[in-house]
Regions:
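Cytosolic regulatory regions of ion transport systems
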Residues: 1-289
């Protein structure tokens, strides 16, 4: 293990992925993140109290370059040693060794991250849906609750036979399957409507791209409709994803519709076989228009 591990203050990496806790799911997670079809393979740092559980790269080439911080991910020192401030994403896996109290450790870890790096993108695995309300007071960006996902996928598979195969295809990283990608709105489409951008992307037939939704940031509100603020008094922003925005309607008060004007910071979600390059194609169509 020592041959691919070094002191965390020697890592010197940025824009990396931090995986908190090492579980049975970690192996597949690493292999998906470092799949040959992934164009931008980010460095991975694992924070775990059991580094001996992480395979050595001599056993599996996928693990070459994996860096390890021995410690509890809910400890701020462990997070700092892993370079939390310069990380692209933090993935918090439920510590399966803690069984029913695994979500409690996850909450403690998110609070620690909120305190020292509130702007980092955080994805958490939650085991019990009853614990979801506790995350309303954190800056977590994405919550994966296996309990809810399993129930909903089972129900949808009954209502729409075969739908599970669609999800399996989209969630498998390879050159032969479609994946979901997120792209920033090209500068020359800022101020234009989602519908105008959709038509331009549809015209890029040679790239085999399907536009499925819009991503934007909005102020997070509580159950009473009040804007939530952090401990500095700043509004808490949350990412919203609108799949297939509807036509503008008087009966709907949503601002995200087909005629919504795109702003800086918005993103589009696309389905494609590989990471698409829409910038060049859209620039050509924009110039012609």
């Amino acid at each position: 293990m020592e041959n691919n591990t070094k002191l965390a203050n020697d890592f010197g990496v940025e824009d990396h992925i931090i995986i908190c806790n090492w579980t049975k799911k970690s192996d597949l997670l690493v292999k998906e993140l470092h799949n040959p079809s992934v164009e931008k393979k980010r460095p991975i740092i694992v924070i775990t109290e059991n580094p001996q559980d992480v395979p050595d790269f001599e056993e599996d080439e996928t693990y070459r370059g994996i860096m390890i911080v021995k410690g509890n991910p809910s400890n701020e020192d462990s997070l700092i040693r892993a370079g939390i401030g310069s990380a692209a994403t933090v993935i918090i896996l439920a510590d399966e060794k803690l069984a029913d109290v695994a979500d409690s450790k996850t909450i403690m870890t998110t609070i620690a991250i909120d305190h020292i790096a509130p702007d980092v993108h955080v994805v958490v695995e939650v085991l019990s849906s009853s614990n979801l309300p506790f995350f309303d007071y954190t800056f977590v960006n994405e919550i994966i609750c296996l309990e809810l996902l399993t129930e909903r996928l089972l129900a949808q598979s009954c209502l729409t036979p075969g739908v599970s195969f669609i999800f399996a295809d989209l969630l498998t990283q390879s050159s032969d399957t479609n994946e979901i990608y997120v792209e920033d709105i090209p500068t020359h489409y800022i101020g234009k409507t989602f519908q105008e951008l959709r038509k331009a992307i549809v015209a890029l037939d040679e790239q085999d791209i399907i536009l499925i939704g819009l991503g934007s940031s909005t102020e997070k509100t509580d159950s009473g409709g009040e804007i939530m603020v952090d401990h500095h008094g700043n509004s808490i922003m949350e990412k919203v994803l609108i799949i297939n925005p509807k036509a503008k309607s008087k009966s709907s008060n949503t601002k995200f519709h087909k005629d919504y004007k795109l702003i800086n910071g918005d993103q589009v979600y696309l389905i494609a076989y590989s990471k698409p390059n829409i910038e060049v194609g859209l620039l050509k169509s924009f110039s012609k228009g």
